[in-house]
UniProtKB/Swiss-Prot annotation:
Site (Participates in the substrate recognition with KAPA and in a stacking interaction with the adenine ring of SAM): 25
Protein name: Adenosylmethionine-8-amino-7-oxononanoate aminotransferase
Location relative to the cell: Cytoplasm
E.C. numbers: 2.6.1.62
Lineage: Bacteria, Bacillati, Actinomycetota, Actinomycetes, Mycobacteriales
Annotated organism of origin: Mycobacterium leprae (strain TN)
Keyword annotations: Aminotransferase, Biotin biosynthesis, Cytoplasm, Pyridoxal phosphate, S-adenosyl-L-methionine, Transferase
InterPro entries for the chain: Aminotrans_3, Aminotrans_3_PPA_site, BioA, PyrdxlP-dep_Trfase, PyrdxlP-dep_Trfase_major, PyrdxlP-dep_Trfase_small
Enzyme class: transferase
Biological process, per Gene Ontology: biotin biosynthetic process
Length: 436
């Protein structure tokens, strides 16, 4: 344990953390009512080694470490890919240089993503990949001589990241960015997309879009699953409709598949549920199997060509760590591991286990909905979940959960067998029962 923590005791880690470290959506220091983070010292397979009451415990990583570790932790093939690449080249600038890991990953992504996505831009995170997607759309229209097409349209209830432009297309009311409303770009928001298919919704969506066509650069949506905006699911037929609508009105379509890509919904990409191709698509999170931060933005050759011959003469974006060889190499390994197994059966088995296990939450006081899509299970409550209660309750059952707002959910690694899925759902039901 000392090696894993660089010689610091858990108490020392906690003290330094409290004094100096920001966490996602956190305060600094020991604020009243805020529970301190749990110290993690190791991760193997689907299990995390955490320090609780001064002692190590094992807990299932029901979150796949925020939806990334689809193969679990410490996978031998991914470890080997990373080690081999580290021995050859850890990093080189991507300006003026290229390398095999980037080329292999680009070709792999072009081969497996929806048809027509032929060019790849690598970035450091999902938020940045969305930012790049929007810049692609804006530069495309400038190159086409239509600079007025600069606004975006999306469904309410979405989440696309924490940088400024992605923030502007997150849900404006129930999202996490209302603090910045006065400085964010004014986008066009359609009503929340329903779970069940209703052609009238798509008709109303088209009517609203048509009112803004001269100023719309793109429609940006999360296909099938709206993630951090509320873990809501919708019928894939809406994707077919929005694809047709965008084509009719000469508006680009961007799919944000950062949370849904690489099998999470039961298809390799959520777009595959209805067989449509967007003009631009963002992937991330599970891309590297949870090892390093990497995302990609793919677009059609038509868009890439228009940008390249436009006034700027280039796509105006270039991250320092773009196409990092370590991240690209481990991503190739992760995707090949996924494709080399019967991942559909694994996700289907997890889906069945989540459905069966979460049935016990139906009818609990305070529970208003239970839903499953692929390897995603959600219990929606009628009030916010208290992490000070939920976290220890889940750890009592040796499960790491991270509820947010009124949602208790899980997106487990694909390696979890039925017994571990049952353990996860038992903890979820326990936590939901404490909310009511």
């Amino acid at each position: 344990m000392s090696g894993a923590t660089s010689g610091l005791t858990p108490e020392q880690i906690g003290a330094i953390d409290a004094a100096h470290l920001w966490h996602p959506y956190s305060t600094i220091g020991a604020a009243t009512g805020v529970i301190p983070p749990v110290v993690a010292v190791a991760a193997h397979g689907a299990w995390l080694t955490l320090i609780r009451d001064g002692k190590p415990i094992e807990a299932l990583d029901a979150m796949s470490s925020w939806w990334t570790a689809i193969h679990g932790h410490g996978h031998s093939v991914l470890d080997a890919a990373l080690t081999t690449q580290l021995g050859a080249m850890n990093h080189v600038m991507f300006g003026g240089l290229t390398h095999e890991p980037a080329a292999r990953l680009a070709q792999l992504l072009v081969d497996i993503t929806p048809a027509g996505l032929e060019t790849v831009f690598f970035s450091d995170s999902g938020s940045v990949s969305v930012q790049v997607a929007v810049k692609m759309a804006l530069q495309y229209w400038r190159s086409r001589g239509q600079p007025a097409k600069r606004r975006l349209m999306t469904w309410r209830g979405g989440y696309h990241g924490d940088t400024l432009t992605p923030m502007s297309i997150c849900d404006p009311d129930g999202g996490m960015h209302s603090l910045w409303t006065d400085i964010l770009a004014r986008q066009v928001f359609a009503p929340q997309v329903p779970r069940d298919y209703d052609p009238a919704y798509s008709k109303a969506f088209e009517t609203q879009l048509a009112q803004h066509t001269p100023e719309l650069a793109a429609v940006v949506v999360e296909p099938v699953v709206q993630g951090a905006g509320g873990m809501r699911f919708h019928d894939p037929r809406y994707l077919c409709d929005v694809r047709d609508i965008c084509r009719r009105h000469d508006v680009l379509l961007i799919f944000d598949e950062i949370a849904t890509g690489f099998g999470r919904t039961g298809e390799l990409f959520a777009a595959d549920h209805c067989g449509v191709s967007p003009d631009i698509m963002c992937v991330g999170k599970a891309l590297t199997g949870g090892y390093l931060s990497l995302a990609a933005t793919l677009c059609t050759t038509d868009i890439a060509h228009a940008i390249s011959v436009g006034a700027a003469g280039a796509l105006m974006h270039g991250p320092t760590f773009m196409a990092n060889p370590l991240a690209c190499a481990v991503s190739v390994a992760s995707v090949e591991v996924l494709l080399g197994q019967d991942w559909r059966s694994r996700v289907a088995e997890i889906s069945a286990g989540l459905t069966a296990g979460l049935e016990a939450a139906q009818g609990l006081p305070g529970v208003i909905d239970v839903r499953v899509c692929g390897a995603i299970g959600v219990i929606e409550c009628d009030r916010s979940v208290d992490l000070a209660v939920a976290t220890p309750a889940a750890l009592d059952r040796r499960v790491w959960l991270r509820p947010f707002r009124n949602l208790v959910y899980a997106m487990p690694p694909y390696i979890c067998p039925p017994a571990e899925i049952a353990q996860i759902t038992s903890a979820m039901v326990e936590v939901a029962g404490l909310v009511g």
